[in-house]
Amino acid sequence: MSTLLEVNNLKTYFFRKKEPIPAVDGVDFHISKGETVALVGESGSGKSITSLSIMGLVQSSGGKIMDGSIKLEDKDLTSFTENDYCKIRGNEVSMIFQEPMTSLNPVLTIGEQITEVLIYHKNMKKKEARQRAVELLQMVGFSRAEQIMKEYPHRLSGGMRQRVMIAIALSCNPKLLIADEPTTALDVTIQAQVLELMKDLCQKFNTSILLITHDLGVVSEAADRVIVMYCGQVVENATVDDLFLEPLHPYTEGLLTSIPVIDGEIDKLNAIKGSVPTPDNLPPGCRFAPRCPKAMDKCWTNQPSLLTHKSGRTVRCFLYEEEGAEQS
Amino acid sequence: MTAANQETILELRDVKKYFPIRSGLFQRKVGDVKAVDGVSFSLKKGETLGIVGESGCGKSTAGRTMIRLYKPTEGQILFKGQDISNLSEEKLRKSVRKNIQMVFQDPFASLNPRKTLRSIIKEPFNTHNMYTMRERNEKVEELLARVGLHPSFAGRYPHEFSGGQRQRIGIARALTLNPELIIADEPVSALDVSIQAQVINLMEELQEEFNLTYLFISHDLSVVRHISDRVGVMYLGKMMELTGKHELYDNPLHPYTQALLSSVPVTRKRGSVKRERIVLKGELPSPANPPKGCVFHTRCPVAKPICKEQIPEFKEAAPSHFVACHLYS
C-alpha cells in the first residue's frame, strides 16, 4: 500500500504571554491508502491539535506549526497558504467534528450546506448538485432524503446530524477523512449505525480515515492501526491486534486495564494515579514518569525517544531500550 | 454483595412524570412529554442498582423524581415504607433529604464557582443545623481526605480543580449528612478513562465503608456492569428489563436489551469470535408522542402484530428476571 499522509516531527505550539506551550511536540506517523488509523489519548494529549494542524486550522486559533512537515501524497501542507488550503479542504481532505450540534450552520438548510461543497469544488450547476446531494443523503441512510434537504439542522437529532456531516465530508470523495470523536456525542445504538456506515463507505471509495477517539472499544472495532498519544507525543504505534494483545508502553497498558469490560468481570479497576499534566507544566524526564508504575531513576531526568521494537512497532519507553539496541 | 434478604430502602410503584407542553396565546396545555411512564422497582439496602438507556429514555428524570426534585405526576415513592411522593418541601427536608443525596453528571456545572470547597461541603450542615462551627470545619477536612483530596484544599475554589477532582468534591458533598442512598446521575461520563477508574474505585470503597445504597444512572453499559448488582434497562420512559447483572448481560431477554448490548464496541483480542451486531433502524421516537402498544415496536426486529396494539406487562419471565415484552407472555 502506498503512503497517503506522512507527518514528520510535527510541532504545534500555542503561546501565552509569549511563553510557548507545546500542545503537539514532535509527532511522527503515516497513513497508507485505504487504511484506518486511530489516534488515541486522553483530553489534553494533543490528538485534536494534530488533526487541526493537518487541516491547517490551528493558525486561526492562535497556534503555530514550529517545525516538521505534513505531506499529503507529494504536497507539503505546512507550506500551504490559506488559498491553497481552500482547494483541498473538503475536496481531498475532509473532517467530521465531534459536536454534531454545533458543526452545522443553523441558518442554512441541509440541502444548501451539502450543495455548497459540490458547487465550490466540483463546479456543479445548482440542479446537478441538488441531485447529487439527495443521492448522498440516501447513501448515509435517510429514507426521506428529499424532505431532509429542506430541513434546518435544529429539526434533526444528533445521529441524523452526524450522518449529514458524513454526507458533506464524503461529497467530493476525499482521499483522507479526519473524524474527530465522530461518535462520542451519540448513543450506542446510533454509534453502531454511524461506525458501520463509515466502514462501508470507506471500503467503497478506498478512503483513508484518521479516527480520533478516546474510546478503545471503537478503536478495536473500526481501526487497522493505533497511535497512542500522551502529552503531545506519540508513545506507541501498533496494529490493533498487537496493541490489545500485548500493550508495550505502561500508559497503554494502564488505559486498557482502567476500562471496565462488558463481556467479563474485573474485580477492581486499575486506575492510573494522578492526572494528565498541563502542557505548560510538563515533567522534565519522561512525561508519563510521575504516573508510571514502572518508572526507573532515569525516567525522571531523561526523555525517552521513540524506539523501534521487534515486529516494527514503535514505543517511547526506556523499558524497551535494551531490546531495541539488540535489534539494531 | 448479597442484598437478597435485606430490607427494602426505596420502592417505586407505577411512578409517572409528565411534563406539560404548552402553546398558544393562553399557554394552554396541548399535550404531555411522558418522560417517565409507569416505572416500578425497589432498591434493597446496600445494593447498587444500575439504570441504563439512551438519551431521552427518562433515566435522569426517574432519578430526580426519586429524590423529589420533581413531583411525580402519578404513583407512589416509598422511602423505608413512608410515601414521600406528596410530602411538602419542609417535611422532605426534615425527614428524607438527609438520607437521600445526589451526585450530578457535570462536575463543572454542579459546583458554585463563587464558593470555596469549605462552604460548598459545609452547606448541608448549615441547612440542617448540625454541629458547632469548629466541628463543621473538622468534618469538611475529614471528608476531603476521605475522597482523596488534601484537606488544605478547603480554601480553594472549584475552578482550581480538574474534572476528576471536582467529581470527588461532588461525592464529598453528597456524603456530608451520612446518607443511606446516593443517586448518581452519570457521575463518570464527563471524565477521561483513567480518571473514570479512580472515581469508580472510590465509589466502591465508600459503599463498603458507609454501607451505602447506590442508584447508578449511566449510558455506559460496561461501567454499569462493573459497579452494579442489578441492572434496569429503560426505553422511552418505561422499564423494559430488570434483573441481576450476570443474568442481564449473559442472557438478555428483551430485544431492545439484546440490541443495546450488541452495539457496544468491545476491545477484541486476536482470534476471538466477532459478535453478531444487531443494528437498530431509526431513532428514538419522541416521548411527547410515543408509539401505541409496545413503545419499542417501531424499531424492534422481531415485532409481532400484537405489539402494535397492546402494551406488554412488566412481569417476571424467569426467577427475579422482569421483562416487558410480548415474546415472554
Curated annotation (Swiss-Prot), chain A:
Chain sites annotated for binding ATP: G41, E42, S43, G44, S45, G46, K47, S48
Principal location: membrane
Span of domain ABC transporter: 5-256
Subcellular location(s) of the protein: Cell membrane
Any one Gene Ontology cellular component term annotated for this protein: plasma membrane
InterPro entries: AAA+_ATPase, ABC_Ni/Peptide_Import, ABC_transporter-like_ATP-bd, ABC_transporter-like_CS, Oligopep_ABC_C, P-loop_NTPase
Pfam families assigned to the protein according to its UniProt record, in alphabetical order: ABC_tran, oligo_HPY
Biological processes annotated in GO: establishment of competence for transformation; peptide transport; protein transport; sporulation resulting in formation of a cellular spore
Keywords on record: ATP-binding, Cell membrane, Competence, Membrane, Nucleotide-binding, Peptide transport, Protein transport, Sporulation, Transport
CDD domains per the UniProt record, alphabetical: ABC_NikE_OppD_transporters
Topology class, membrane: Peripheral membrane protein
GO molecular function, one term: ATP hydrolysis activity
Family: Belongs to the ABC transporter superfamily.
Functional description taken from the UniProt entry: This protein is a component of an oligopeptide permease, a binding protein-dependent transport system. This APP system can completely substitute for the OPP system in both sporulation and genetic competence, though, unlike OPP, is incapable of transporting tripeptides. Probably responsible for energy coupling to the transport system.
Protein's recorded name: Oligopeptide transport ATP-binding protein AppD
Organism this protein belongs to: Bacillus subtilis (strain 168)
Source organism phylogeny: Bacteria, Bacillati, Bacillota, Bacilli, Bacillales
Encoding gene, per UniProt annotation: appD
Swiss-Prot record, chain B:
Lineage: superkingdom: Bacteria
Binding site for ATP: G53, E54, S55, G56, C57, G58, K59, S60
Cell compartment(s), UniProt: Cell membrane
ABC transporter domain span: 10-261
Keyword field: ATP-binding, Cell membrane, Competence, Membrane, Nucleotide-binding, Peptide transport, Protein transport, Sporulation, Transport
BP terms from Gene Ontology: establishment of competence for transformation; peptide transport; protein transport; sporulation resulting in formation of a cellular spore; transmembrane transport
PROSITE patterns the record matches: ABC_TRANSPORTER_1 (PS00211), ABC_TRANSPORTER_2 (PS50893)
Annotated Pfam families: ABC_tran (PF00005), oligo_HPY (PF08352)
UniProt signal peptide: none
One GO CC term, this protein: plasma membrane
UniProt xrefs under NCBIfam families: oligo_HPY, PRK11308.1
Function: This protein is a component of an oligopeptide permease, a binding protein-dependent transport system. This APP system can completely substitute for the OPP system in both sporulation and genetic competence, though, unlike OPP, is incapable of transporting tripeptides. Probably responsible for energy coupling to the transport system.
Family per similarity comment: Belongs to the ABC transporter superfamily.
Protein name per Swiss-Prot or TrEMBL: Oligopeptide transport ATP-binding protein AppF
Lineage: Bacteria, Bacillati, Bacillota, Bacilli, Bacillales
